Amino acid sequence: MTQAQNHIVPPGSKVLVTGANGYIASHIIKVLLDLGYLVQGTVRTPMPWLTEYFEKRYGSGRFELIVVSDFQQSDAFDESVKGVSGVIHVAQGLPSSTAAETVESATAYTVNGVVNLLKAASTKPTIKRVVLTSSIVAAGYPAGKGFKLDVDTWDKSLEQASKGGTTVPIYRACKVEGERQAWKWVEKNQPHFELNTVLPWLTLGKILHPNIGGSTMGYVSGLLKGDTTPFKFLPLPWFVDVEDTARLHAIALISPSVRSERLFAAATPFIWGDVIEILKRIQPNNARIPAAPVKEEPTIGDIVPAARAEKLLRETFGQRGWTPLEVSLEGGIARE
């Protein structure tokens, strides 16, 4: 680790992490606790099992939960930001039933929650950094080989849809506007804190607790039962390990060299054949693991800022580089 005295948010400070029961958020909490921070996590309903999980590993008084049931309320975060020195907003709100939503109403829902948090943070001079969990789709989901993403790249599907009458997936639209409007709000209102964002691609690795859904790792775990949904639902992407993603959030919170920056969490492209091969090595007697799709090619391109993120992981946490796919899956799948 870098010297603690250089951290923008010093160890021992309290950090707010929203959506504490989520896959990525739970790993962020673990990383922060490992670094010596106190953590307050938000959940929509009481979840004593989560408090028990972290107290068992870090002792009492290091982690606490606060219920924030509705991000849409203008005062939703007023209590949770009290006494904290940094905020990591992982749980960008999505409508509970996106099927009935228009793109406009869905993005308004997400943006409203983000802005409510930024407004609440702006009232607390103790808060030095706010980190927003965005997504690679905010920068533009590559359609094929030869793509290039950079720090100034934004997904253009919303603009194209408005001109040509095409539709945009609700999730993508919400992630794009959630991050874009956060930057616009900061530019307009000039709060005392700095904003950084983290844009992960397909995140894999260990699920910390059985009650945590596992998000994208849950799809991969389903392959062990013969569920081929990921082959159809998830286009061939790049992968990133969940702990690498969590560490990049911590870096965005504490590093004096990361200022008003977008950190891209994307390690390497892969094909489902790679995943199937690794799963069969981990569980060689599991006959339910399906065959990989016949025709696959990795999505080769250039994510320019990924090199910067990898360098930060090496400098801050002493890593050799991105965690390899095999190591990530071995950490997340039980051996037979």
From Swiss-Prot:
Entry annotated with the keyword Oxidoreductase: yes
GO biological process: terpenoid biosynthetic process
Molecular-function annotations in GO: oxidoreductase activity, acting on the CH-OH group of donors, NAD or NADP as acceptor
One Pfam family of this chain: Epimerase
Pathway(s) per entry: Secondary metabolite biosynthesis; terpenoid biosynthesis
Binding locations of NADP(+): Y171
Keywords: Oxidoreductase
E.C. code: 1.1.1.-
Matching SUPFAM superfamilies: NAD(P)-binding Rossmann-fold domains
Function: Ketoreductase; part of the gene cluster that mediates the biosynthesis of andrastins, meroterpenoid compounds that exhibit inhibitory activity against ras farnesyltransferase, suggesting that they could be promising leads for antitumor agents. The first step of the pathway is the synthesis of 3,5-dimethylorsellinic acid (DMOA) by the polyketide synthase adrD via condensation of one acetyl-CoA starter unit with 3 malonyl-CoA units and 2 methylations. DMAO is then converted to farnesyl-DMAO by the prenyltransferase adrG.
Record-stated family: Belongs to the NAD(P)-dependent epimerase/dehydratase family. Dihydroflavonol-4-reductase subfamily.
Protein name: Ketoreductase adrE
